[in-house]
Amino acid sequence: MSKLILIPTPIGNLDDITLRAIECIKDVDLILCEDTRRSLKLMNHLVIKKPLKSFHKFNEHSTVEKIIFEIQSGIKVGLISDAGTPSISDPGYLIVKMCIDNNIDVECLPGPTALIPALVISGLPSDRFTFCLLYTSPSPRDLRK
């Protein structure tokens, strides 16, 4: 059955991947990934061979329609990010939206995201919070301005 599955990957330790994520990786026909080199390390660690296709912020707009067509043709596609849950400050929103618009099933596995552990150990109240953006350190060039 054709579908898109968002598969969270470990943040840091490759052994932190869930059994369900491993089974989904084995089950899909194609894996979309931010960086094929980094994803290949995970695949080698898991001893799984699957076709990997680069899908990142620089090419998602130019490749998403072709991927939607592939899913509609009957394949099952997994989307992984370099670390954590796809679409949380990573590529994913566009393909999920297009799958929904095209009546393609989308599944998201539970798994690691840096957001919740950061909140839990912050000492801040965790019953209500807002996540607005991913903070990145300024580049040296930005600091010179």
Describe these PLM feature segments.
Residues 135-145:
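Single conserved hydrophobic/aromatic residue that forms the stacking wall/gate
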Residues 3-7, 73-81, 129:
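Generic beta-sheet signal
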Residues 1-58:
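Glycine-rich, flexible N-terminal cofactor/catalytic loop recognition
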Residues 9-13, 114, 139:
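Amphipathic alpha-helical repeat scaffolds
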Residues 59-66:
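Glycine-rich, highly charged phosphate/nucleotide-binding loops
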Residues 94-137:
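Class I SAM-dependent methyltransferase SAM-binding "motif I" and its flanking Rossmann-like core
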Residues 37-39, 85, 114:
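Alpha-helix capping/helix-boundary segments
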Residues 68-106:
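Glycine/small-residue-rich loop that forms an oxyanion/phosphate-binding "nest" at active or ligand-binding sites
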